[in-house]
Swiss-Prot record:
Disulfide bond annotation, renumbered to this chain: none
GO biological process, one term: isoleucine biosynthetic process
Catalytic EC class: oxidoreductase
Gene Ontology CC, one term: cytosol
Gene3D superfamilies: 6.10.240.10, NAD(P)-binding Rossmann-like Domain
Organism of this sequence: Bacillus velezensis (strain DSM 23117 / BGSC 10A6 / LMG 26770 / FZB42)
Positions annotated to bind NADP(+): Y25, G26, S27, Q28, R48, S52, D82, E83, Q84, Q85, G133
Keyword Transcription set for record: no
Protein name as catalogued: Ketol-acid reductoisomerase (NADP(+))
Metabolic or biological pathway: Amino-acid biosynthesis; L-isoleucine biosynthesis; L-isoleucine from 2-oxobutanoate: step 2/4; Amino-acid biosynthesis; L-valine biosynthesis; L-valine from pyruvate: step 2/4
Protein family: Belongs to the ketol-acid reductoisomerase family.
Gene behind this protein: ilvC
Amino acids binding substrate: S251
Function recorded in the entry: Involved in the biosynthesis of branched-chain amino acids (BCAA). Catalyzes an alkyl-migration followed by a ketol-acid reduction of (S)-2-acetolactate (S2AL) to yield (R)-2,3-dihydroxy-isovalerate. In the isomerase reaction, S2AL is rearranged via a Mg-dependent methyl migration to produce 3-hydroxy-3-methyl-2-ketobutyrate (HMKB). In the reductase reaction, this 2-ketoacid undergoes a metal-dependent reduction by NADPH to yield (R)-2,3-dihydroxy-isovalerate.
């Protein structure tokens, strides 16, 4: 059974006298920095010159280059996209990691897959809120919080767990509950969820349903409504009440269709494919492919992305969403399964 920690379980004043550097000031960085600051913790921000630098200053933070922030800090939280972390770490953080400091992440990818190899004389842990930055910030302001994960990779001081929990408390996570895990478990389950269910599996399912209807002669607009637009209603019900709560809220006809047809679509073969996806994550195949793809400037990524953006479901969706003033249009990218961009 997972171990969960709350505010009352966490030692007081663990971060007193320590300086925390937030590296990156996107959605998560913004939330972490403000929440920690309002929790009475000494926070600075390390970020490149640009909009994020200016925004951090306007929010009242002391802002430095990444190297300068890392040099000053006792605790360095890296909140950059996975694919940027190794380069920034090697160029601007590594040499500032003197003995006794703590190196912190919100996702274990680069440490688990050995793209970042921390020195042996620093603590290494992760604190990962299970929600996007705007939610981490909003719930904190409301006196609540978003559940978070923490894991210890390297405990040189003997105090890494206390420090990790104190950090989680500082961003509001311990108000909701902080769950203990490992870098391996956090990384592999996060990647699997993204690939097999939340992003890869779901988008493939939606497209397959849309194509099945349109290829059978149904109007693409109706196919869009039934296979994509109405998804939010169902997901919101599952989010709030679980599968059983969702089924309670839908019609009996829909529920019966769920029972008899769902297993025909997601059958044993699909589950076997999911197991292969998990194996590729566990043995490092996916990580190697993604690392190489970034090293050669993402030719496959860019080609697939361009092709997907031209799918009929996108064209129909853009037209239909113009009829829906209640749907926010635009390019806002608030990722719920990863840390925010710098």
């Amino acid at each position: 059974m997972v171990k969960v920690y709350y505010n009352g379980d966490i030692k007081e004043n663990v971060l007193a006298g320590k300086k925390v550097a937030i590296i990156g000031y996107g959605s998560q960085g913004h939330a972490h920095a403000l929440n920690l600051k309002e929790s009475g913790i000494d926070v600075i921000v390390g970020v490149r010159q640009g909009k994020s630098f200016t925004q951090a200053q306007e929010d009242g933070h002391q802002v430095f280059s990444v190297r300068e922030a890392a040099a000053q800090a006792d605790i360095i939280m890296v909140l950059l996209p996975d694919e940027q972390q190794q380069k920034v770490y090697e160029a601007e953080i590594k040499d500032e990691l003197t003995a006794g400091k703590s190196l912190v992440f919100a996702h274990g990818f680069n440490v688990h897959f050995h793209q970042i190899v921390p020195p042996a004389d620093v603590d290494v842990f992760l604190v990962a809120p299970k929600g996007p930055g705007h939610l981490v910030r909003r719930t904190y302001e409301q006196g609540a919080g978003v559940p978070a994960l923490f894991a210890i990779y390297q405990d040189v001081s003997g105090e890494a767990k206390d420090t990790a929990l104190a950090y989680a408390k500082g961003i509001g996570g311990a108000r909701a509950g902080v769950l203990e895990t490992t870098f391996k478990e956090e990384t592999e389950t996060d990647l699997f969820g993204e690939q097999a269910v939340l992003c890869g599996g779901l988008t493939a399912l939606v497209k397959a349903g849309f194509e099945t209807l349109t290829e059978a002669g149904y109007q693409p607009e109706l196919a869009y409504f039934e296979c994509l637009h109405e998804l939010k209603l169902i997901v919101d019900l599952m989010y709030e009440e679980g599968l059983a709560g969702m089924r309670y809220s839908i019609s009996d006809t829909a529920q019966w269709g769920d029972f008899v047809s769902g297993p025909r679509v997601v059958d044993a073969k699909v589950k076997e494919s999911m197991k292969q996806v998990l194996t590729d994550i566990q043995n490092g195949t996916f990580a190697k492919e993604w690392i190489v793809e970034n090293q050669v400037n993402r030719p496959r990524f860019n080609a697939i992305n361009a092709s997907e953006n031209e799918h009929q479901i996108e064209k129909v969706g853009r037209q239909l969403r113009e009829m829906m003033p209640f749907v926010k249009q635009g390019k806002k990218k608030e990722a719920v399964v990863s840390v925010a961009q710098n």
